[in-house]
Swiss-Prot record:
It catalyses: L-seryl-[protein] + ATP = O-phospho-L-seryl-[protein] + ADP + H(+); L-threonyl-[protein] + ATP = O-phospho-L-threonyl-[protein] + ADP + H(+). This is Serine/threonine-protein kinase SCH9. Disruption phenotype: Sensitive to high hydrostatic pressure (mechanical stress); simultaneous disruption of RRD1 exacerbates the effect. Residues 1-23, 249-272, 286-302 have a biased composition (Polar residues). Residues 672-748 form the AGC-kinase C-terminal domain. The lineage of its organism: Eukaryota, Fungi, Dikarya, Ascomycota, Saccharomycotina.
Length: 824
């Protein structure tokens, strides 16, 4: 399904994949899987390879492949969060020879390790607890904690009081980004009070996100009944229990809840499964520029009587419903790889279709601190104005620096297989020291060398490094990368909501409002890439992931190209989403190919099928180059149709976005009701929240992969087949490794069954299943909307053409351009 694995040919950034699968399991014959394979997303429904010619001469990723010192975490190309290998171009070969001969290279490993500043801190203010029944607890905590006498500061601020620009200014005040925090952030969700719940049977749980890593709590350990009169007593009790010195924080938090009766029905188990009829919301087919913030109506109390009842209960002196006072004591640990990152804590009700109960956003400033902690009540906030939210949540966080510099496969426990592809596999893994869940892609060096894809593989990693260093909220982040003599490893955020393809396949199509939300976030992601001179080139549902809250994250940069200042000629992509200029224009194409794919994607989301789908690739290319787009009645609003037509203009110079890139798309009337700043900060409630029972939930991924056994991955067995590559070949991967290369030999025996278990899956093209489409007679042919300046609509291009493509066997795609057009 997902294209997490890409296989490209020799010295071109090429690829061509058609990875959709018909819901009934039928193969439509579109066997032109671009750069073959699926090595770059999570699950992979298809893997097929075929080399493609290109007019590029191999001068790819020059700024990246010449990098000589490699960071252990994806912070930037020259700012290191966990130390470097320090491999230089002059001694790379010697280093690799030493590695294979078991010779230590400690000196080189430490040559470029950045200095860690560990300024000591007066711990008196770090562990203070501020109890406040009103909404001023956060401000009070800031006033109390900000001590001018401390040599370092720990500042906690709320979203409402600190804008993005202000946060950036505050970050600059704390020093340059060369002092990136390296440590662990332990977060304990203790309890909440005065929640607005629908009934005493409500089952609150928490989704906690930090640097795109997710934690999904179980249900409460117990539910307590409290009086408002006792709030101050509770605050005093927490103040008495505060930990002023970090060295004394060994108290077991679970003991504090032993006196509560466990009447919640949770019994310490995972979240209960939701009945099937609660998972599906009615599909409506037409809404013109409606407010997205009204989509949360199912996530708030809509009955006025219930609202008044719940609101009044918040100020009464009587006892609360048990469900309004959940006690969790759930603890999780996050890897701190960046600086000034946001800690997002959202509360939901599993018993009422994951109703939203409130949110807290914190910005723990831990710059240059060896230790820091805080133990405090925070007022829950709504995401939008009309959400009914009240109550407070008690949160404790503790930050500690770590000394570890190098990571390898032994630091991760494999949990589930998420996908397979040409180069290797993608696994759900758990980092052993923090228990954090990640996705780990394992690529076989032998296959990469055989397909001559070393430069592209390193280029993909460096694009991920670039996007991580200039973070976008809607792009999957790279956390770690390292290598052994046999394999390459990329460790990224695990998005538990699964891929958008999986949800689209199950539901058939989305409402216009839901599609608009996803497209708007994709516009921000593509704008971020284009502003950094990166063309994505493989936009499709398989490469779009959902997080636990329902926001999207773009993944799979296997076909992306960096440093694109003008045009490129590489023939790559997925058939249904290819732009016509990629087929027809011998002068190459620009970043506008991404916006064409975006137009195809929104059409597919709303209508339920691809606008250019055909039973074979030759007909599909003809439709892309010359076919008319047909809209079913009452599926897209007039603004939506105008937006799609603007994106599907065959002349890239007149396509929507050609003048001002993503900013031009954001100004379109289709997005008139979007608050872009709020969307960028993820303040707009997603129209759909994935149903999850834990942070390790894989129910939104293909069970064909997730049910496969991975027990052999965690066993250290002798090497069965392949031997390490020669030192000369190993040296070619010097720009990839993040692990201490003197320790690579000890990992050589861990991962040799990957190639044995790899396989090629049958390719196909996906049409969402049974979306209750309108009858044929309701299809509208928009004949009058052709662009008179569109020079690509000339049917004469079809004259005297003959096929130059082989549609059998390995699906080789010949991208020879003849007389300004692709031979169809």
């Amino acid at each position: 399904m997902m294209n997490f694995f890409t296989s490209k040919s020799s010295n071109q950034d090429t690829g061509f994949s058609s990875q959709h699968q018909h819901p009934n399991g039928q193969n439509n014959g579109n066997n032109n899987s671009s750069t073959a394979g699926n090595d770059n997303g999570y699950p992979c429904k298809l893997v097929s390879s075929g080399p493609c010619a290109s007019s590029n001469n191999g001068a790819l990723f020059t700024n990246f492949t010449l990098q000589t010192a490699t960071p252990t975490t994806a912070i930037s190309q020259d700012l290191y969060a966990m130390g470097t290998t320090g491999i230089t171009s002059e001694n790379a070969l010697f280093q690799m020879k030493s590695m294979n001969n078991g010779i230590s290279s400690v000196n080189n490993n430490n040559s470029n390790t950045p200095t860690i500043i560990t300024t000591s801190q007066e711990e008196t203010n770090a562990g203070n607890v501020h109890g406040d029944t009103g909404g001023n607890s956060l401000q009070n905590s800031e006033d109390d904690n900000f001590s001018s006498s401390s040599t370092t500061k720990c500042l906690l601020s709320s979203t409402s009081s600190l804008s993005i620009n202000q946060r950036e200014a505050a970050a600059a005040a704390y020093g340059p980004d060369t002092d990136i925090p390296r440590g662990k952030l332990e977060v304990t969700i203790i309890e909440a009070r005065d929640l607005v719940t629908r009934s005493k049977d409500s089952q609150p749980y928490v989704v906690c996100t930090f640097e795109s890593s997710e934690f999904i709590s179980n249900g409460p350990e117990s539910l307590g009944a409290i009086n408002n009169n006792n709030n101050n007593n509770n605050n005093n009790q927490h103040n008495q229990n505060q930990h002023i010195n970090n060295n004394n924080e060994n108290t077991n938090p679970d003991a504090a809840s032993q006196h509560h009766n466990n009447n919640s029905g949770w019994n310490g188990s995972q979240l209960p499964s939701i009945k099937e009829h609660l998972k599906k919301k009615p599909l409506y087919t037409h809404r013109s520029s409606s407010q997205l913030d009204q989509l949360n109506s199912c996530s708030s109390v809509t009955d006025p009587s219930k609202r008044s009842s719940n609101s009044s209960s918040g100020s009464s002196n009587g006892p609360k419903n048990d469900s309004s006072h959940p006690i969790w004591h759930h603890k999780t640990t996050f890897d701190v790889l960046g600086s000034h990152s946001e800690l997002d804590i959202s509360v939901y009700d599993a018993a009422h279709d994951h109703m939203f109960l409130g949110q807290v956003r914190l910005y723990p400033m831990i710059h240059n601190l060896a230790h820091a902690s805080q133990h405090q009540w925070h007022s829950l906030k709504p995401r939008v104005i009309d959400e009914v939210v009240s109550g407070d949540i008690l949160i404790k966080w503790t930050y500690k620096q770590t000394k570890k510099r190098h990571y390898g496969p032994q630091d991760f426990e494999v949990l589930r297989l998420l996908g397979k592809g040409t180069f290797g596999q993608v696994y759900q893994v758990k980092k052993k020291d923090t228990q954090r869940i990640y996705a780990m892609k394992v690529l076989s060096k032998k296959v990469i060398v055989k397909k001559n894809e070393i430069a592209h593989t390193i280029g993909e990693r460096n694009i991920l490094v670039t996007t991580a260093s200039k973070s976008s909220p809607f792009i999957v982040g790279l956390k770690f990368s390292f290598q052994t003599p046999t394999d390459l490893y990329l460790v990224t955020d695990y998005m538990s909501g699964g891929e958008l393809f999986w949800h689209l396949q199950k539901e058939g199509r989305f409402s216009e409002d839901r599609a608009k939300f996803y497209i708007a976030e994709l516009v921000l992601a593509l704008e971020h890439l284009h502003d950094n001179d990166i063309v994505y080139r493989d936009l499709k549902p398989e490469n779009i992931l959902l997080d636990a809250n329902g926001n999207i994250a773009l993944c799979d940069f296997g076909l992306s190209k960096a440093d694109l200042k003008d045009r490129t000629n590489t023939f790559c992509g997925t058939t249904e989403y290819l732009a016509p200029e990629l087929l027809l224009d011998e002068t190459g194409y620009t970043k506008m190919v991404d916006f064409w794919s975006l137009g195809v994607l929104i059409f597919e989301m709303c209508c339920g099928w691809s606008p250019f789908f055909a039973e074979n690739n030759q007909k599909m290319y003809q439709k892309i180059a010359f076919g008319k787009v047909k809209f079913p009645r009452d599926v897209l609003s007039q603004e939506g149709r105008s937006f799609v037509k603007g994106l599907l203009n065959r002349n890239p110079k007149h396509r929507l976005g050609a003048i001002d890139d993503g900013r031009e798309l954001r100004a379109h009337p289709f997005f008139a009701d979007i608050d872009w700043e709020a969307l960028k900060q993820k303040k707009i409630p997603p129209p759909f929240k994935p149903h999850l029972v834990s942070e390790t939930d894989t129910s939104n991924f293909d069970p064909e992969f997730t049910t496969a056994s991975t027990s052999y991955m965690n066993k250290h067995q002798p090497m069965m087949t392949a031997t390490p590559l020669s030192p000369a070949m190993q040296a070619k991967f010097a720009g990839f490794t993040f692990v201490d290369e003197s320790a690579i030999d000890e990992h050589v025996n861990n991962n040799r069954k990957f190639l044995q278990n790899s396989y090629f899956m049958e390719p196909g093209s996906f049409i969402p299943g049974n979306p209750n489409l309108p009858p044929d007679e309701d299809v509208i042919d928009d004949d009058g909307d052709e662009d008179i300046n569109d020079g690509f609509n000339q049917e004469k291009n079809m004259n005297n053409s003959h096929s130059q493509m082989d549609f059998d066997g390995d699906q080789h795609m010949d991208d020879e351009f003849v007389s300004g057009r692709f031979e169809i």
